[in-house]
Amino acid sequence: MTQLDRSVAPAIRQLEHFSILQPELYRMKNGMPLYVLSAGNEDVIRFDLLVRSGQLDQSQPPQAVFTNRMLREGTRSLSSSQIAEKLDYYGAWLDLSSSVNYGFVTLYSLGKYFPKTIEILASMIKEPIFPEKELSVVVDVNKQQFLVNAQRVDVMARKRLNRALFGLSHPLGRYAELEDYDRINSEVLKSFYHQYYHSGNCSVYVSGKVSPEVIHCIEQHFGESDWGDTTRKIKNETFVPTTEDCKRIFVEKEDALQSSIKIGTFSINQQ
C-alpha cells in the first residue's frame, strides 16, 4: 500500500463531462409554476410545495413555524390520526419546515401510490382547520423543547450573534420567548394561513421518476383553478438592521460544561 506524501498537494485537474440536469418548467392553468426534474429509475417521487412566507412575514413569533407545523393536525375531511395512518399505510413520509423566507411542505412517496398520497397532501394544504386540542399539545411539546434548547451554549451564542447583527427591532434579531408560545392560538395561525397559503403565492417542485400520471395528479389537485384567498395582498416589508458597535461579545453561563463560538458578518443579499 502506497504511503501518501501529505506534504505535497494533490494535482489540480479540470472536470470533464460535468453537467447538471435542469428542471422543466410547466405553468399550470391557475398560473402556479411546476418545476419537474425527472431522474432516476426507482419508483420514488419527491413533491415539494414552496410557500413564499416565513419568519420575516409573521406578525408575532413563532407564527410561521406553527402555521406550517399544524397542517398535518387535521383538515375538514381528515383528522390528524387519519392523516398519519394513511401516509404510513402507503409508505409515504412527510416533512414540514419553515425558514426565514419560505415555508416548505415535502412529501416522499412511491410512484404507484402517488395519486393517493397527493390527495391527502392536497387536503392538508387547502383545507386545514388548526384544531385547538391538537394545537395545545403541539405548543406544549415545543415549549419543552424551547426550555431545553435555551440552556444549550450553541443556541445562546447564535441568538446573541443575530441580535448583535440585526437588532431587536428586526425579525432576524428577535427570537421567540417562552411567553410567545402562550400567545399562539388557532385564529393567529388562520390569519397567517389565509394571507400566504394560496395558489398565487406557492410553487411546486417534483423530482424522481416523474411520469405523465404524476404531473396530471399535481395539476388536478393544485393547478386546475385558484385555491386559497388569492385576493390577499402580499406585504413586502423592508427591515433595516441596527448593528451593535461591539465586535466581541462574551456571554457567561454558570456551570456550563462546553463553550460555543459564533462568528458572523453581513454578506451578499439574497438575489
Where are these regions (language model features)?
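Charge-rich, well-structured scaffold segments of protease-associated domains
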Residues: 1-8, 27, 82-233
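His/Glu-rich zincin catalytic helix
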Residues: 1-85, 190-271
